[in-house]
């Protein structure tokens, strides 16, 4: 057979226009708040270097010194009294207010990102809080000096450390600060506090515009021809004809050879033979070649990270709207850092079922799920009869009937109305949950709406009131002390555990309308959905242009033998042709059925003695025929010269066909002869093997079919979160605003770049065979095609009885006078076929008168089958015919009735996860988020340095006189 050469690749088709954006889904109702999830425990990154110390605030202006009090008149000098009893300890002073926090230092560089994939281990439990650092020693108490005048208030210092509660001694000058204690190592993070109330969800972005359709792929190469079907059964042979009447003996004819007479009129065509069985269906052809990949889109611009908004409470899942068109697949972005697990949202309401999608390719069968138990529900109502189903399994082949004459094809019938759908039965109980499928590829984000604000969180716990101290005596104002040197800020303390969540503030005012963002990257491909219902049949497309004639295909398997056509009218007598060369001996044919006995022929020339044949079975003796009258004996003449070879006689009747011979070597191609007259239209033969398809050329696109456009597939799961942005500087707490109105919807974003073409998926399994459509009218018969090369086909089954072969040449007259016909003897065994002898020489004597023809004997019984003859010589190769043109395409038959929707196939395995898309462009600044919960109390501040000793105060008033 020939080698299949794929044709050149056709040009790419025009690029499709982007589809319209999908309609937004309805706003969902607020669902109950979800249960708080377990706190995540990712590995703690290395601690960054400490930031530079913050700048100290400018000192405030010095207060004006107070006026000294007027000096009173000196009292009388009293006697020196006895030492009085020790006074009671003074009341504990009120605790001073905590100093304001210093400016926050610049954040140190972030530690290295954890780029590796998330480990499969379970979440770790939160570690226990580490021990607090050792506290520094308190400074020694200085001696109490006289109280000085009260100086002006200095600038607020850094918060001092809370000292231990002690007994108030006599107030002295502040001692110098003791050595600072060693800072303790930070302990492991303590248990996470209760999660604060979630913020309002941000509005979802607009769906991206539908990407351009890729160029159509090149049509796949056609499949190889199917295997040859089995031949039909051999028809029974007809009974022998009746015996003809005996002819009268004719007058002796002239020895001169007359010219051949005109050909007789052809008889009427015989009845058609029985139609053979249809051949078996061929194997499916190989998978077609994949189409060319589409153009790769450019990477999208990388956006700037937006400010982190306060997360609102997760609203309930709204009803599932019609998903928008899938955006183009963006360029792969950098792998994001795995985020901590979020709180699980509340289960959304069941969405309305979507429209049936287009027919997907049948995926490989999935694992069979467990059979569900029968539910206790009542049986459903009986549905109405549905539309015609698929044909059932093919029954056993019946006995072949006699083929009738082929009728004229009728006009196509009208399409019947579709049957009514059956009523839905009562819903049964849910079956057991099947195994969890693999995670589908990420789909595009749907157009969600902002949910309603969630309920307010629980109010925070009120702090415990401190113990009220005893108010101390108001001392005399001391003198203003000298301004101390500027101290350095202390190191930041260990972060304490988070405090309880405070009450939730009111919703802020709505912000400005944000600009439309660019469409996000195309998500991974989702799982294949269930097979949708069969769509309505499309209109007949425009007939494509006839493609160029392809190279001759390899010789296909021989087709089934066609029915014998009617015999054509006899042609005019042809001129006597020149004798051809003797061909190679052909293969022996099988013994044909015994025909009726022919009339007695004239004796032929004596041939060479044939080889001794095998002895056949003896046949029964035939009846003796009547003895004819003896003819006159002629004079024996002298042998004459050898005559010229006679011309070929008229063609005889066609003999039975022989068995298929062995394939000989191909002969040389002969010259093309003149085209013969058109023959009668024969019956349609069996379907031959399919040849190879020539190079595919893309024809003009046909008109769109009348079927409805399928709805897009379901949204895929959410993608992995992106890398967190740098931590911003903490702002001051804003005023709680009133809840604002919802902003207007932004304009749809620009279409994103076209993504890379997806990889070719595995070839789906063959679908079920549909019902056969009505047969269309026969197409115009094309001219005969070129004969293919002779292939080494398998030996076929014996053929049916063929038409009688051409009559052989008439033998030459022998040299002797014709003898008297003898009585017919018993039929002897059939000998082997003798070789053709050389032409005998013509005798010199005159030909004797021909004896009267004997009466025709009855038909003898069928003799035994003869031995296989010698293989004949191979004939010359026939003239190569012109290749015919392709026949015109017949009109399409009426569309068949739509079949019932088949059961949903098993979900195919999830495809490989595509690379993450590139980051989208930054959106506008969002609304001011709600104030976060009050953070935990800051670390304990460092004890400030002791100030300088103030100047001595004025003398106090004289004490009371002592006891006498």
Curated annotation (Swiss-Prot):
Biased composition annotated in UniProt, kind: Gly residues: 294-303
Subcellular location: Secreted; Secreted, Extracellular space; Secreted, Extracellular space, Extracellular matrix
Transmembrane segments: none
Glycosites: 92, 880
GO CC annotation: extracellular region
Keyword Secreted: yes
Comp. bias (Low complexity): 106-117, 126-144, 192-231, 347-373, 381-400, 459-468, 564-578, 591-618, 647-663, 709-721, 850-864, 898-931
Residues with PTM Phosphoserine: 98, 567
Keywords in alphabetical order: Extinct organism protein, Extracellular matrix, Glycoprotein, Hydroxylation, Phosphoprotein, Secreted
Main location: secreted
Residues bearing PTM 3-hydroxyproline: 665, 936, 951, 954, 957
Residue numbers bearing the 4-hydroxyproline modification: 18, 21, 24, 33, 36, 39, 53, 68, 74, 83, 89, 126, 147, 156, 159, 186, 189, 201, 207, 216, 222, 225, 240, 249, 252, 260, 269, 284, 290, 299, 305, 323, 332, 338, 344, 353, 356, 365, 374, 379, 391, 400, 409, 412, 430, 447, 453, 459, 465, 471, 477, 489, 498, 510, 519, 537, 552, 558, 579, 585, 588, 597, 603, 621, 630, 639, 651, 657, 666, 675, 678, 704, 712, 721, 739, 748, 751, 757, 772, 778, 784, 792, 798, 818, 821, 824, 895, 898, 916, 931, 937, 952, 955, 958, 961, 964
Family the entry assigns: Belongs to the fibrillar collagen family.
Role: Type I collagen is a member of group I collagen (fibrillar forming collagen).
Protein name: Collagen alpha-1(I) chain
Organism listed in the record: Parocnus serus
């Amino acid at each position: 057979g020939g080698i299949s050469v794929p044709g050149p690749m056709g040009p790419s088709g025009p690029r499709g226009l982007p589809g319209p954006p999908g309609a937004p889904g309805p706003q969902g109702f607020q669902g109950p708040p979800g249960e708080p999830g377990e706190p995540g425990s990712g590995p703690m990154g290395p601690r960054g270097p400490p930031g530079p110390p913050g700048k100290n605030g400018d000192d405030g202006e010095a207060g004006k010194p107070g006026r000294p009090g007027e000096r009173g008149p000196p009292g009388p000098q009293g006697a020196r009294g006895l030492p009085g009893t020790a006074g009671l300890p003074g009341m504990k002073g009120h605790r001073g207010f905590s100093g304001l926090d210093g400016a926050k230092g610049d954040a140190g560089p972030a530690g290295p990102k954890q780029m590796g994939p998330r480990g499969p281990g379970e979440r770790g439990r939160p570690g226990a809080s580490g021990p607090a650092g050792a506290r520094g020693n308190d400074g020694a108490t200085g001696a109490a000096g006289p109280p000085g005048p009260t100086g002006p208030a200095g600038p607020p210092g850094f918060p001092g450390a809370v000292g231990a509660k002690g007994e108030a001694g006599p107030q002295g000058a502040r001692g110098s600060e003791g050595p600072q204690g060693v800072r303790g190592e930070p302990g492991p993070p303590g248990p996470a506090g209760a999660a604060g109330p979630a913020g309002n969800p941000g509005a979802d972005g607009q769906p991206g515009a539908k990407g351009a359709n890729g160029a159509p792929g090149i049509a796949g190469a056609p499949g190889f021809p199917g295997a040859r079907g089995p031949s039909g059964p051999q028809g029974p042979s007809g009974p022998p004809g009746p015996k003809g009447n005996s002819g009268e003996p004719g007058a002796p004819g002239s020895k001169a050879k007359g010219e051949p007479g005109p050909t007789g009129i052809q008889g009427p065509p015989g009845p058609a033979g029985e139609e053979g069985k249809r051949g078996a269906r061929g194997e499916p052809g190989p998978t077609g070649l994949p189409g060319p990949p589409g153009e790769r889109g450019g990477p999208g611009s990388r956006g700037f990270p937006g400010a982190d908004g306060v997360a609102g409470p997760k609203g309930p899942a709204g009803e599932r709207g019609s998903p928008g068109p899938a955006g183009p697949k963006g360029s792969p972005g950098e792998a994001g850092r795995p985020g901590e697990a979020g709180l699980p949202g509340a289960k959304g309401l069941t969405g309305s079922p979507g429209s049936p999608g287009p027919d997907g390719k049948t995926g490989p069968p999935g694992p069979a799920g467990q059979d569900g138990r029968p539910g206790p529900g009542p049986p459903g109502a009986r549905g109405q009869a549905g539309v015609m189903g698929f044909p059932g399994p093919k029954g056993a082949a019946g006995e072949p009937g006699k083929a009738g004459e082929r009728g004229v094809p009728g006009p196509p019938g009208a399409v019947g109305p579709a049957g009514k759908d059956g009523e839905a039965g009562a819903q049964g109980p849910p079956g057991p949950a099947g195994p969890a499928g693999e995670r589908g590829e990420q789909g595009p984000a749907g157009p969600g709406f902002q949910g309603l604000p969630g309920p307010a969180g629980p109010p925070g716990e009120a702090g415990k009131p401190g113990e009220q101290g005893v108010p101390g005596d108001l001392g005399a104002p001391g003198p203003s002390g000298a301004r101390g040197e500027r101290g350095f800020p202390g190191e930041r303390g260990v972060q304490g555990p988070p405090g309880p969540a405070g009450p939730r503030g009111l919703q802020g005012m709505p912000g400005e309308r944000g600009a439309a963002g660019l469409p996000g990257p195309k998500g991974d491909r989702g799982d294949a959905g269930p097979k949708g219902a069969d769509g309505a049949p499309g209109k007949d497309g425009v007939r494509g242009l006839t493609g160029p004639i392809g190279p001759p295909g390899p010789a296909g398997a021989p087709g089934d033998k066609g029915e014998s056509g009617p015999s054509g009218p006899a042609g005019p007598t042809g001129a006597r042709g020149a004798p051809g060369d003797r061909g190679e001996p052909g293969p022996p044919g099988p013994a044909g059925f015994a025909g009726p006995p022919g009339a007695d022929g004239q004796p032929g020339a004596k041939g060479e003695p044939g080889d001794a044949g095998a002895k056949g079975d003896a046949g029964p003796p035939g009846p003796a025929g009547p003895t004819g009258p003896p003819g006159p004996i002629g004079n024996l003449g002298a042998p004459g010269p050898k005559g010229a070879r006679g011309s070929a006689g008229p063609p005889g009747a066609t003999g039975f066909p022989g068995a298929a011979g062995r394939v000989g070597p191909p002969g040389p191609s002969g010259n093309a002869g003149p085209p013969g007259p058109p023959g009668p239209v024969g019956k349609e033969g069996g379907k031959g093997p399919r040849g190879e398809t020539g190079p595919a050329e893309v024809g003009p696109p046909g008109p769109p079919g009348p079927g409805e456009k399928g709805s897009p597939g379901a949204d895929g799961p959410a993608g992995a979160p992106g890398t967190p942005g740098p931590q911003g500087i903490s702002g001051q707490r804003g005023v709680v605003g009133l809840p604002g109105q919802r902003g207007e919807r932004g304009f749809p974003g620009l279409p994103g770049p076209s993504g890379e073409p997806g990889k070719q998926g595995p070839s789906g399994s063959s679908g079920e065979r549909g019902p056969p459509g009505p047969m269309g009218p026969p197409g115009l018969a094309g001219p005969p095609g070129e004969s293919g090369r002779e292939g080494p086909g398998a030996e076929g089954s014996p053929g049916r009885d063929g038409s009688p072969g051409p009559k052989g040449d008439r033998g030459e007259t022998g040299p002797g006078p014709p003898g008297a016909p003898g009585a017919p003897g018993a039929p002897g065994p059939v000998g082997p076929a003798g070789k053709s002898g050389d032409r005998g020489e013509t005798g010199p004597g005159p030909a004797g008168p021909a004896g009267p023809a004997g009466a025709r004997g009855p038909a003898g019984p069928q003799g035994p089958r003869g031995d296989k003859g010698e293989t004949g010589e191979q004939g010359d190769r026939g003239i190569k015919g012109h290749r015919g043109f392709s026949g015109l395409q017949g009109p399409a038959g009426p569309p068949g009735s739509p079949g019932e929707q088949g059961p949903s196939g098993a979900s195919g395995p999830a495809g490989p996860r595509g690379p993450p898309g590139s980051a989208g462009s930054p959106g506008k600044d969002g609304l001011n988020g709600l104030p976060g919960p009050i953070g935990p109390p800051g670390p304990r501040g460092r004890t400030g340095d002791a100030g300088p000793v103030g100047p001595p105060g004025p003398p106090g008033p004289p004490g009371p006189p002592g006891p006498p």
